[in-house]
Design a protein with these regions (language model features):
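Structured domain cores in non-transmembrane regions
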Residues: 47-94
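N-terminal interaction modules that seed assembly of large macromolecular complexes
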Residues: 26-57
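Acidic, proline/glycine-rich low-complexity IDRs
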Residues: 1-27, 31, 54, 64-72, ...
């Protein structure tokens, strides 16, 4: 069965909202340096990730989301997202069939909405962070954030 992108969009928006609520109980959201979603180059999973401004300067690899203090926070909120993405597996899980030209803009649009609602007026950088680095990360950071904030990623 192909991925149901409209259903995925709603599930992802809800998961991110729940994630932000959980994260806000742990830290003042204005104290974050970065917030976003982490994935593979196949886009076969999406997980929340965030790091604080206080820890940012001491990180040996600042752009390694797996090292961020809030990597994977509220992952349970993404169960429906995970299930919907699993629909993209074909041929006994040998092939992951995703329309990246459709999915990446969908994710970026939802993250841009999150930035408007939760981080307007802050310097929190929001993005789609892809394992191993990827043009999607660069594109998402530029599309989601004000130019001054996006410059921090370069």
């Amino acid at each position: 069965m192909p991925i149901r992108y409209e259903v995925l969009a709603d599930a992802l928006a809800g998961a991110l909202q729940e994630c932000l609520g959980i994260l806000a109980r742990e830290v003042d959201l204005r104290e974050l340096a970065v917030f976003g979603l982490y994935t593979s180059g196949e886009l076969n999973y999406l997980g929340p990730t965030a790091e604080t401004k206080s820890r940012w300067p001491s990180l040996p690899f600042q752009w390694s989301p797996a090292d961020w203090v809030f990597h994977g926070i509220a992952q349970d909120a993404f169960k429906e997202v995970d299930a919907l993405l699993l629909e993209g597996w074909r041929d006994g899980c040998d092939t992951f069939d995703v329309d990246a030209e459709r999915l990446v803009p969908l994710i970026v649009s939802i993250l841009a909405d999150v930035r408007r609602r939760a981080f307007t007026g802050t310097d929190v950088l929001v993005g789609l962070f892809v394992a191993g680095g990827h043009r999607w990360t660069d594109q998402s950071v530029e599309m989601i954030n004000p130019p001054k904030v996006a410059l921090r990623y370069r």
